[in-house]
């Protein structure tokens, strides 16, 4: 299962093509729209989120509510395009139109300057339009398909925010996907402990008032994953590495940890490894899950615990200094639009990106021409594991 995304932030539409989804999987536009809506919510978001109410149009690969094995094309219209038709036109336009919304003041922390240098652009809008986090809409759309597939296989994924800037959100060590959904899933801050919500809102409002932004840490958990996805035999088959790469590919994500994560570097080994136990009904399990469900680049059958750190949103209403690329004069960086934080939305992106990698791995490992074939292969595999 592989995919591509395309589309500019203010272009006519965003597109994703997914290939390799098993035939026979029930899939509707509504399945995807639910996830798109989640990405657009969350405390601290404004502006464009109110303009756009994303709706997907499926234009290939699905017939009468079921996938047919051919590439699935997903389209999301940018409703704002009507105000950008000439500026974003594919055909050549008059010079005076080219000057409208031209960007020559690169924003620190964005792709603007380096992208312009790399691709020889005079108008840095060519960079902004594609490097914008608007692209994550399609990662969520693809993830929605992946989650639908995983759900059929009784594999579930959820996320919650564990840090907003300096504010740590308390949550128990043992946390099921169901519990995350019932708590963080109902919170506009995407947090487990609702008693911290009021303080957090005040904190975010203060950051906004100061024209500043905050980042944080998001945790995604995956349940129902059998042992043995990924492999130790080659560097590029290690599933933890694939997940880490996918998470860092999300705009503004700068690091990933599994289980104890960086804390593992500070503890002696006796306080890090998970002891192996065996029982008649469960087979091999671990007495704890400090390694976050991975050993040797493979899932070990425990819950996957992945955390990603998101840097603060780089566009500040209290703009940072930059250099105008035409005049080389110092200038205050342009503000296209910005929010104090996008953590709850970024959590939805992360959850869907992790789901996509797990679904890809499953489709690679097992016969996956049809969903029935895949289900059967997984049942047989789990049976084999239980007899080991
Ligand atoms: C869900 C989400 C929403 C984002 N919203 C904004 C935003 O409103 N303004 C902004 O400047 N950056 C936003 N970003 C981050 C930028 O897209 C990102 O920092 C930038 O493209 C540079 O990429 P890098 O941080 O990965 O180096 C957002 C990121 C995510 C994941």
UniProtKB/Swiss-Prot annotation:
Pathway: Metabolic intermediate biosynthesis; chorismate biosynthesis; chorismate from D-erythrose 4-phosphate and phosphoenolpyruvate: step 7/7. GO terms for molecular function: chorismate synthase activity; FMN binding. Disulfide bonds: none annotated. It comes from the Bacteria. GO terms for biological process: amino acid biosynthetic process; aromatic amino acid family biosynthetic process; chorismate biosynthetic process. GO terms for cellular component: cytosol. CDD domains: Chorismate_synthase (cd07304). It catalyses: 5-O-(1-carboxyvinyl)-3-phosphoshikimate = chorismate + phosphate. SUPFAM superfamilies: Chorismate synthase, AroC. Gene3D superfamilies: Chorismate synthase AroC. The keyword Transit peptide does not apply. Its EC number is 4.2.3.5. It is an enzyme of class 4 (lyase). Pfam families: Chorismate_synt. NADP(+) binds at residues 39, 45. This reaction introduces a second double bond into the aromatic ring system. Homotetramer. This is Chorismate synthase. It comes from Lactococcus lactis subsp. cremoris (strain SK11). The lineage of its organism: Bacteria, Bacillati, Bacillota, Bacilli, Lactobacillales. The gene is aroC.
């Amino acid at each position: 299962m592989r995919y591509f995304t395309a589309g500019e932030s203010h272009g006519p539409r965003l597109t994703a093509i997914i290939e390799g989804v098993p035939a026979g999987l029930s899939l509707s536009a509504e399945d995807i729209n639910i996830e798109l809506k989640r990405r657009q919510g969350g405390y601290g978001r404004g502006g464009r989120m109110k303009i756009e109410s994303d709706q997907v149009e499926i234009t290939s690969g699905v017939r009468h509510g079921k996938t047919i094995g051919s590439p699935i094309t997903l389209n999301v219209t940018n409703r704002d395009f009507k105000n950008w038709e000439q500026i974003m036109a594919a055909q050549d336009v008059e010079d005076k139109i080219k000057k409208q919304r031209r960007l020559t003041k690169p924003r620190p922390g964005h792709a603007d300057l380096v992208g312009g240098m790399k691709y020889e652009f005079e108008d840095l809008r060519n960079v902004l339009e594609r490097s914008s986090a608007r692209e994550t809409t399609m990662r969520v759309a693809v993830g929605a398909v992946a989650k639908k597939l995983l759900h059929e296989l009784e594999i579930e994924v959820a996320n919650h925010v564990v840090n907003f800037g300096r504010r740590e959100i308390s949550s128990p060590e043992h946390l099921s996907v169901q519990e995350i959904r019932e708590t963080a899933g109902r919170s506009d801050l995407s947090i487990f402990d609702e008693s911290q919500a009021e303080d957090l809102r005040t904190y975010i409002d203060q950051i906004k008032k100061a024209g500043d932004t905050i980042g944080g840490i998001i945790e995604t958990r995956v349940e129902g994953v059998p042992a043995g996805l990924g492999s130790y035999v080659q560097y590029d088959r290690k599933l933890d590495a694939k997940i880490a790469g996918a998470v860092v590919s999300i705009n503004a994500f700068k690091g990933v940890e599994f289980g104890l994560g960086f804390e593992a570097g500070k503890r002696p080994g006796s306080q890090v490894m998970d002891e192996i136990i065996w029982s008649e009904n469960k087979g091999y399990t671990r007495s704890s899950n400090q390694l976050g469900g991975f050993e040797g680049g493979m899932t070990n059958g425990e819950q996957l615990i992945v955390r990603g750190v998101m840097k603060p949103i780089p566009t500040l209403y209290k703009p940072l200094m930059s250099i105008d690329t035409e005049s080389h004069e110092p200038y205050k960086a342009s503000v296209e639009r910005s929010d104090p934080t996008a953590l709850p939305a970024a959590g939805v992106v992360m959850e869907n990106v992790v789901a996509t990698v797990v679904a890809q791995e499953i489709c690679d490992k097992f016969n996956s021409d049809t969903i029935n074939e895949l289900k059967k292969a997984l049942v047989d595999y789990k049976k084999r594991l239980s007899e080991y």
